Amino acid sequence: MQRFTVSNLSGYLVTHGRTFREPKEDILFFNWSCDTVEFIFSGTHLNVSFRAGCGWELEGPPSDPDVPKRATWPWVAVFLDDNPAPVRKFEVASPNETWLLHHSPEPQTHRIRLVKLTENSKTFLGITGFS
């Protein structure tokens, strides 16, 4: 399966909100919640690869030095064509993950929108490529 980097597709990826490209590692980061990356896809199979980092939430009063913490990983919504509701939502729960966005037996063309749902103060999320 062929892999395409963010640089390979820069002319085809439309961003909304505060996204930024980190050129050294060629990652397109979502900087805020509701940031969006949109593109047209034609084919039978599409994966997206993410780089993610977790934040930490306190599970009790912040004044308690022994309060337990839990990891918070970024959540993504996938919108297909003009559907007002996402076709799926998922948590990117490790530093490097690849997710299936589309699979069909025959080639199809769709407009795909990826939306970061979580606050940036709690997590970070970037796209490293497509395959």
Give the location of each predicted region.
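N-terminal secretory targeting modules
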Residues: 1-131
